[in-house]
UniProtKB/Swiss-Prot annotation:
Listed PROSITE patterns: BCOV_S1_CTD (PS51921), BCOV_S1_NTD (PS51922), COV_S2_HR1 (PS51923), COV_S2_HR2 (PS51924)
Positions bearing the site annotation: Cleavage: R756, S757, R905, S906
Any one of the GO CC terms: viral envelope
Name this polypeptide is given: Spike glycoprotein
Transmembrane segments: 1302-1322
Gene Ontology terms describing biological process: endocytosis involved in viral entry into host cell; fusion of virus membrane with host endosome membrane; fusion of virus membrane with host plasma membrane; receptor-mediated virion attachment to host cell
Native species: Rat coronavirus (strain 681)
Location of the BetaCoV S1-CTD domain: 327-605
């Protein structure tokens, strides 16, 4: 059992293996050989590589945990080296100097059984750190005589260790000098641990998280247990294993083995037994089988098809680009310069288009710490930036705490402000005192204008640091000197004086008489640091980011001179000084501001790689000038890159394009495929069959998608690439445990796997669970048979809906609401404490809730919803989602009968066009429907009204121009152009006809108006008569009531005559306490009302919140998609919805189809085939159609055959019935005690004194009403109305009979002739001719013609 020694070894003992730090140089002829890679892979199935997090255990549990674990199946590297005389001095460089990143897992060989004579360590020592100098912490785990010495100290690790194999030791007999620190280093942990010295292998788990280092240990190949942890506060970036002793010369001595594999943050599935021991573990991302186990949280998943979500194509290569041959930034030279400024005059330098090595920079300046803001410090290594701006200054020892982020001490308030919002790193380092001098300088221009001198004021040593304790700003006209003529007469308090520079004003001084002496009272006395004189023009100021202190304070009494204003050296105040030295080193602060992260050509070369070729068409990782990610490159021809531009971004800030400065080619960058993998897993199979949906196998293997290294077989199907299954789609099965969809099934057979050596046992077959004939031949209903109505026909319906999503904000002045301007009430309201504040706080929360809801609604609308309208054809504008053509009306050629144009114009057109109203007797509307807005159809749309052709009498400008042009042309060139005047003439005649028929209708209307108005006058007369009668009755009743009231008051005065006297006595006895009680009652009442109002506001806001959530839901489900819910988006089955902003809410227009007719069918919840297999419908019903079972959808009756596409196969035909619980609301009312008993309980022996009330009848003024004057006025008004009777004149009308056209008379004559000829022949042929001729003889003698004419009857006008 591992335990900790309480005693520590002496700190001077720093033994690591057999190494000593002696200045003897080994050779650099050859590099150290590369670490060997193990043939053994990491197998985590038994818990290897895992750890008990802080020794926590779980009993009989299987759960998912996320931590730092190795990748299952990864390789080990042996990081151990054998120390020899010829060991290369490059042994501590990569690859043996390795990245620590998240952590490492180590498997270490215990060499105790074959330990060389004299050796005290059983395995090599591991060192984990960043720069391995005494300015940062280093973790060392050193074995020594059966213990492990763990330490975390600020070591300076020896980089050139020397072994005992070297014969020349230089006379140095000291053993154990493995670091070069001359004095004991600063440590945060030094502890000793025992370990099982008899174990063959030792296992270590090292990782870092949030600045804390964790170490775990085990002596068996299972989960490790907690060893120690310590907060370091910095990122450990590298590690190496010290070479182990000389090459053994004794036979049987083993070589050291230190097998290491990296850790990454991964999710593992653990199984804990009844003792809390990890018995098995699964790396969830290592294989598809592992992912299935983690998905089901079971070590033995059930047989089934699992969709593996979050699947992404794995990159197959790396595209790396850096600008080569850039100069070195030489940042370390500037940081280590022999002069450094003070905080008062901090310096900045910007580095751009150059490279730097951060690791060597930190070693060069012997960095104490490096911490970053808004970026992980470990990520700065190897990144690129647009530029790096660095500020630096020496740190006064007493003010070091001021530089912590978030502090507001003197340094950050008045000297240098750190921008916590910027991406920056804070570097603390030190230089030897002999190599640096502090430059103290005051950059203030207005201080220097009045005589400030750095040497005279600061007179500091080489390592003294000046800093400001306060900063002051002044105006352009400021001058600290008093005016000589003003202070000349002063005897006491007389300051120095001098003339001020041009454009400035002297210090303000007032001369005051004090006895026989005059006294000067001047501004800013005694010091601007302590004065509160508002006349003092030196104003304190705080620093902004990037600002220097504007100036130190000035003791104005010490400013003067014989001519020009000048201040003495000791006149400047508000600064202090301290040394920067500690341990003979000057400590310096530097702020590195990283501009343009992952873009630009200012790069760290710590992990720089050689440039690679750009591979197109496959998924690759990329690192383009520090911008990292993965994607697919496609070469394109692009001319939109500027000369300074290499990367192209989209509107979301994602990398979209890349210009290669090496080849000058341009590329388009697309993301790697992220899709869906279905895994068909069988419990008896070692691995699943895989279906990469919608992907060809070539793409799968070219992009290294599959995590299976060597699949046995694969092929393309119409569902995608199938891996680890045989293609047997020509076979069909009627039972399937692994259904892939679309009628395909993966069938697993152990026998099939055994028969074929290259088979996994999986086959992709066709799944046919049943046929239509089987269903109808051997089927019975499951769960009963029911009648149901299913729609067969629909109609489209529109439904408008308003949903309130916000309300006006309310704020209340509580004091004004309760008390108004009454002072006593306001004073007493203070006793109610924070009631008013609580009211306003609640209303503030309500208003904030309104803002939050409005933001949520706006977010839902912004994402994919357009509120602008669809404009009608002929109007320019963007075509969007909502049609507002009913609002705009009908414009252009699309207008036809029945459209909006025929029904009227819209409100918008009323504004855009002049409007002319016509009297329409029935033909104007028909004319508009015919033209449809096309004026050229004017004569083609002539209307007929009672046999007369008519047109509307109003012409547009274009029609007038056209007809005028035609008439002019007909007059200019007769007779050839005479036809051009015909349209004009017809138009005029038809419009005159239209005016004539309109006048007749107007005449009839006049008659109706006159009759109606005369009837109204008569009704008004009757009304006034009734009013006059009613007023007379009112007068009599009021007077009678007044007389009765007078009698009543006379009677009451005898009984209540003492009322006024009693009230006066009561008022005189009210004291302040009683008055306050009355005020208190009023305040309570009003506060109760206010509280009720606020409660109602909260209640209403709850309803609005619910409706706003419903509005968001309807935007997402109705507007952005088609809702499957019935009657949710309108009434019926949803088609589409439109949304528009409305006052305090949203206005929805839903379109849906509503059933208009139904059919009644027999429906069964399920069917049973052959008594053993059940069928259930998918999104529909099983119905009987002409004796056969069919499937139909639930929304529309359309019977079709039952197949596996519309049904679900069940293992049995059993039906489970569940009885619904009978739960009723409690409607009983609690019995209350008798009201009188409860009243008597609280009010006993209560008496009231009846006051003596008297009443003075003389003070009551009883008035009798006399309404005769008002009634006379009404009677006069009736008389005037009678005299204003209107006698309307009737407009005359004309009746016009139109002569029939000549061709009508011609047809009548021809018909008569034909009749006569027919009669003649009939008479001749029948023997009746003699009779006919006799009778017609006389007719022939009197034959004559008659002409019909036009008769016009004139009805003269007359008066009624």
């Amino acid at each position: 059992m591992l335990f900790v020694f309480l005693t520590l070894l002496p700190s001077c003992l720093g033994y690591i293996g057999d190494f000593r730090c002696i200045n003897l140089v080994n050779t650099r002829i050859s590099n150290a050989r590369a670490p060997s890679v193990s043939t053994e892979v990491v197998d985590v199935s038994k818990g290897l590589g895992t750890y008990y997090v802080l020794d926590r255990v779980y009993l009989n549990a299987t759960l998912l945990l996320t931590g730092y674990y190795p990748v299952d199946g990864s390789m080990y590297r042996n990081m151990a080296l054998m120390g020899t005389n010829t060991l290369s001095l490059n042994w501590f460089e990569p690859p043996f100097l390795s990245e620590f990143n998240d952590g490492i897992y180590a498997k270490v060989k215990n060499l105790k059984a074959s330990l060389p004579i004299g050796s005290a360590s059983y395995f090599p020592t591991i060192i984990i750190g960043s720069n391995f100098v005494n300015t940062s912490y280093t973790v060392v785990l050193e074995p020594y005589n059966g213990i492990i010495m763990a330490s975390i100290c600020q070591y300076t690790i020896c980089q050139l260790p020397h072994t005992d194999c070297k014969p020349n030791t230089g006379g140095n007999t000291l053993i154990g000098f493995w670091h070069t620190d001359l004095r004991p280093p600063v440590c945060i942990l030094k502890r000793n641990f025992t370990f099982n010295v008899n174990a063959e292998w030792l296992y270590f788990h090292f990782y870092q998280q949030g600045g804390t280092f964790y170490a775990y240990y085990a002596d068996v190949s299972s989960a490790t247990t907690f060893l120690f942890s310590s907060y370091i506060g910095a990122v450990l970036t590298q590690y190496f294993v010290l070479p182990y002793m000389c090459s053994p010369t004794t036979s049987g001595v083993s070589s050291p083995q230190y097998w290491v594999t990296p850790l990454v943050k991964r999710q593992y599935l653990f199984n804990f037994n009844q003792k809390g021991i990890i018995t098995s573990a699964v790396d969830c991302a290592s294989s598809y089988t592992s992912e299935i186990k983690c998905k089901t949280q079971s070590m033995n998943p059930n047989t089934g098809v699992y969709d593996l979500s979050g699947y992404t194509v794995q990159p197959v290569g790396l595209v790396y680009r850096r600008v080569r041959n850039l100069p070195d930034c030489k940042i370390e030279e500037w940081l280590a310069a022999n002069t450094v400024p003070s905080p008062l005059n901090w310096e900045r330098k910007t580095f751009q288009n150059c490279n730097f090595n951060l690791s060597s920079l930190l070693r060069f300046v012997q960095a104490e710490s490096l911490s970053c803001s808004n970026i992980d410090a470990s990520k700065v290594y190897g990144m690129c930036f647009g530029s790096i701006s660095i500020d630096k200054f020496a740190i006064p020892n007493s003010r070091r705490v001021d530089l912590q982020l978030g502090k507001s001490g003197l340094l950050q308030s008045f000297n240098y402000k750190i921008d916590t919002r910027a991406t920056s790193c804070q570097l603390y380092y030190s230089l030897a005192q002999d190599n640096v001098t502090v430059i103290n300088h005051n950059p203030s221009s207005w201080n220097r204008r009045y005589g400030f001198n750095d040497v005279a004021t600061f007179h500091s040593g080489e390592h003294d640091v000046a800093y400001a304790e306060a900063c002051f700003t002044v105006g352009a006209s400021y001058c600290p000197c008093a005016k000589p003529s003003t202070v000349y007469s002063c005897v006491t308090g007389k300051p120095k004086s001098a003339n001020c520079p041009t454009g400035t004003s002297n210090r303000e001084c007032n001369v005051q008489a004090s006895g026989f002496k005059s006294k000067c009272d001047c501004t800013c006395n005694p010091s601007p640091l302590t004065t509160y004189d508002p006349r003092c023009l030196q104003a304190r100021s705080m620093l902004g980011v990037g600002d220097h202190c504007e100036g130190l304070g000035i003791l104005e009494d010490k400013c003067g001179g014989s001519n020009i204003c000048n201040c003495s050296a000791d006149a400047f105040v508000g600064w202090a000084m301290d040394s920067c030295l500690s341990n003979a080193r000057c400590h310096i602060f530097s702020n590195l501001m990283l501009n343009g992260i992952n873009s630009g050509t200012t790069c760290s070369t710590d992990f720089q790689l050689p440039n690679t070729e750009v591979v197109t068409g496959v998924c690759v990782k990329y690192d383009l000038y520090g911008s990292t990610g993965q994607g697919v490159f496609k070469e394109v021809k692009a001319d939109y890159y500027n000369s300074w531009q290499n990367l192209l971004y989209d509107v979301n800030g994602n990398l979209n394009g890349f210009r290669d400065i090496v080849t000058n080619k341009t590329y388009l960058l697309r993301s790697c495929y992220s899709g869906r993998v279905s895994a068909a897993y069988h419990q008896d199979a070692p691995e699943p069959a895989l279906l990469y949906r919608n992907l060809k196998c070539d793409y799968v293997f070219n992009n290294n998608i599959s995590r299976e290294e060597t699949p046995l077989n694969y092929f393309d199907s119409y569902l995608g690439c199938v891996i680890n299954a045989d293609n047997s789609t020509e076979q069909s099965v009627d039972a399937c445990d692994l259904r892939m969809g679309s009628g395909l099934c993966v069938n697993y057979s152990i026998a099939h796997r055994a028969r074929r050596s290259v088979s996994t046992g999986y086959k992709l077959t066709t799944f046919e669970p049943f046929t239509v004939s089987i269903v109808n031949d051997s089927v019975e209903s499951v769960g009963g048979l029911y009648e149901m109505q299913i729609p067969t026909n629909f109609t489209i319906a529109s439904h408008q809906e308003f949903i309130q999503t916000r309300s006006p904000k309310v704020t209340i002045d509580c004091a004004a609401f309760v008390c108004g301007d009454y002072t006593a009430c306001r004073q007493q309201l203070v006793d109610y404490g924070s009631f008013c504040d609580n009211i306003n706080a609640i209303l503030g929360e309500v208003n904030n809730l309104i803002d939050t809801m409005q933001l949520q609604v706006a977010s839902a609308l912004i994402q994919g919803v357009t509120l602008s309208s669809r404009l009608a054809d002929g109007i320019s504008g963007q075509i969007d989602d909502i049609n507002f053509s009913p609002l705009l009306g009908c414009l252009g050629s699309d207008c036809s009968e029945g459209t909006k144009a025929a029904q009227g114009r819209s409100a918008i057109e009323d504004v855009l066009f002049d409007k002319v109203k016509l009297s329409d007797v029935g033909f104007v509307e028909s004319y508009n429907n015919c033209t449809g807005g096309q004026e050229v159809r004017d004569l083609l749309c002539v209307q007929s009204f009672n046999g007369i052709k008519v047109l509307p009498p109003v012409l547009s400008e274009s029609q007038i121009s056209g007809y005028t042009a035609g008439a002019t042309a007909s007059a200019m060139f007769p007779p050839w152009s005479a036809a051009a005047g015909v349209p004009f003439a017809l138009s005029v005649q038809y419009r005159i006809n239209g005016l004539g028929v309109t006048m007749n209708v107007l005449s009839e209307n006049q008659k109706m108006i006159a009759s109606s108005f005369n009837n109204a006058i008569g009704a008004i007369q009757e009304g006034f008569d009734a009013t006059n009668s009613a007023l007379a009755k009112i007068q009599s009743v009021v007077n009678a009531n007044a007389e009765a009231l007078n009698n009543l008051l006379n009677q009451l005065s005898n009984r209540f005559g003492a009322i006024s006297a009693s009230l006066q006595e009561i008022l005189s006895r009210l004291d302040a306490l009683e008055a306050q009680a009355q005020i208190d009652r009023l305040i309570n009442g009003r506060l109760t009302a206010l509280n009720a109002y606020v409660s109602k506001q909260l209640s209403d806001m709850t309803l609005i919140k619910v409706s706003a959530a419903q509005a968001i839901e309807k935007v997402n489900e109705c507007v952005k998609s088609q809702s499957p819910r019935i009657n949710f988006c309108g009434n019926g089955n949803h088609i589409l919805s439109l949304v528009q902003n409305a006052p305090y809410g949203l206005y929805f227009i839903h379109f849906s189809y509503v059933p208009t007719s139904f059919t009644t069918v027999n429906v069964s919840p399920g069917l049973c085939i052959s008594g053993d297999r059940g069928l259930a419908p998918k999104a529909g019903y099983f119905v009987q159609d002409h004796g056969e079972w069919k499937f139909t959808g639930s929304n529309y009756y359309y019977p079709e055959s039952i197949t596996d596409k519309n049904s679900v196969v069940m293992s049995s035909c059993a039906v489970n019935y569940t009885k619904a619980p009978e739960v009723f609301l409690n409607t009983s009312i609690t019995n209350l005690p008798d009201f009188k008993e409860e009243l008597d309980k609280w009010f006993k022996n209560q008496t009231s004194i009846v006051p003596d009330l008297s009443f003075d009848i003389g003070k009551l003024n009883v008035t009798f009403l006399d309404l005769s004057y008002e009634m006379n006025r009404i009677q006069d008004a009736i008389k005037n109305l009678n005299e204003s009777y209107i006698n309307l004149k009737e407009i005359g009308t004309y009746e016009m009979y139109v002569k029939w056209p000549w061709y009508v008379w011609l047809l009548i004559g021809l018909a008569g002739v034909a009749v006569c000829v027919l009669l003649f022949f009939i008479c001749c042929c029948t023997g009746c001719g003699s009779c006919c001729f006799k009778k017609c003889g006389n007719c022939c003698d009197e034959y004559g013609g008659r002409q019909a004419g036009i008769v016009i009857h004139n009805i003269s006008s007359h008066e009624d």
